[in-house]
């Protein structure tokens, strides 16, 4: 354990929208498949989020949450459109708030990444263009103008539903090859109308979704997640990638959202190193506006290092979002501040559908339990 409290940048308070965080260690959104067949979070999901609200002033971002039945792409993922779903989320939010923490709901539409077997009731596999994820994969249908407008409205209604359920805000999932990203990136978007064909047009869908969500719930309740370099689901391969995301991020800055979340998935190209593992080019575009969350395999040491480096370069608005380590370490902020090693995670149980295994059975540190008088 640390001998003295650290003054590290990672441990300094940060205002995110309406939320006054006591440190800069965020729980990143992680899909876990612990919802029933109707997209209602299972009863024990409340305990999962409650465990990770272990240090007051922590921001948690939920797993990806479907905005409508048509947006569904996988079984056992939660939704936010029905009253039973919202009631389950109200209980989860109440549990998090009782621990003096904050929680944003991540809003999701899968597009062409959906499992075709899940698309029941005459739902089509849809995307920006009729371009499959893989060359011989299922062929999606390009959305029409009316459908695009309806999807934008659906994101706005989902945001209202989330705020009605008590969430402190929402995060728009514009990353990792899902529907919004399918409009942003030229590797998928082959349109030649006002939704494609140029950097500005490809960014339009993300911008209009964000604008509609802001109009619905307020800019200080809206975060946006992007993943410029992610190669997941056929993304991250376009030319003009940096200019595309520089433009989009500049537009998000003008919209004055509560935060920008930039995620780096595991780099898949073994032939060359990652061009920008800490998204420094995009941090510069974002500047000193609202907070910027960086995610991408950080541990305690690398999180402290990058926040110090960013602060030294005048970017004092940087926070770190932990995914896998927050799964395995419910008391993660406490451990990092105390200098206690983070717990190893079991990747095999990340997606153990409907199971408590690998979900509720990661222990708190002995030091945390002693401090909070847990029974031994």
Swiss-Prot record:
Keywords: Alkaloid metabolism, Flavoprotein, FMN, NADP, Oxidoreductase. FMN binds at residues 29-31, 64, 106, 173, 225, 297, 323-324. It catalyses: dihydrochanoclavine-I aldehyde + NADP(+) = chanoclavine-I aldehyde + NADPH + H(+). Its cofactor is FMN. Its EC number is 1.3.1.100. Belongs to the NADH:flavin oxidoreductase/NADH oxidase family. This is Chanoclavine-I aldehyde reductase easA. The lineage of its organism: Eukaryota, Fungi, Dikarya, Ascomycota, Pezizomycotina.
């Amino acid at each position: 354990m640390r001998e003295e409290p650290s003054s590290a940048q990672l441990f300094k308070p940060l205002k995110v929208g309406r939320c006054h965080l006591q440190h800069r260690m965020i729980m990143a959104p992680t899909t876990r498949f612990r919802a029933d067949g109707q997209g209602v979070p299972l009863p024990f999901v409340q305990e999962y989020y409650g465990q990770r609200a272990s240090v007051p002033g922590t921001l948690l971002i939920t797993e990806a949450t479907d905005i409508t039945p048509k947006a569904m792409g996988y079984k056992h993922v939660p939704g936010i459109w029905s009253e039973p779903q919202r009631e389950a989320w109200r209980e989860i939010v109440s549990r998090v708030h009782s621990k003096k923490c904050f929680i944003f709901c991540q809003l999701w539409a899968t597009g062409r990444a959906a499992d075709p077997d899940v698309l029941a009731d005459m739902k089509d596999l849809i995307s920006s263009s009729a371009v499959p994820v893989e060359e011989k994969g299922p062929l999606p249908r390009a959305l029409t103008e009316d459908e695009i407008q309806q999807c934008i409205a659906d994101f706005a209604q989902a945001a209202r539903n989330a705020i009605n359920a008590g969430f402190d805000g929402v995060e728009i999932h514009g990353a990792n090859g899902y529907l919004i990203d399918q409009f942003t990136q030229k590797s998928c978007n082959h349109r030649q109308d006002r939704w494609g064909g140029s950097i500005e047009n490809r960014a339009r869908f993300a911008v209009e979704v964000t604008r509609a969500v802001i109009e619905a719930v307020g800019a200080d309740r809206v975060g946006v997640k992007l993943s410029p370099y992610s190669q997941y689901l056929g993304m991250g391969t376009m030319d003009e990638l940096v200019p595309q995301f520089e433009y989009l991020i500049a537009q998000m800055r003008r919209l004055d959202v509560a935060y920008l979340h930039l995620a780096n998935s595991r780099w898949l190209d073994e032939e060359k190193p990652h061009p920008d593992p800490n998204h420094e080019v995009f941090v510069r575009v974002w500047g000193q506006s609202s907070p910027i969350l960086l995610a991408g395999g950080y541990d305690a040491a690398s999180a402290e290092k990058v926040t110090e480096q960013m602060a030294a370069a005048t970017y004092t608005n940087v926070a770190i979002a932990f995914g896998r380590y927050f799964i395995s370490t419910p008391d993660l902020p406490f451990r990092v501040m105390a200098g206690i090693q983070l717990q190893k995670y079991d990747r095999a149980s990340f997606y153990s559908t409907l199971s408590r295994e690998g979900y509720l059975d990661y222990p708190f540190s002995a030091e945390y339990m002693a401090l909070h008088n847990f029974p031994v």
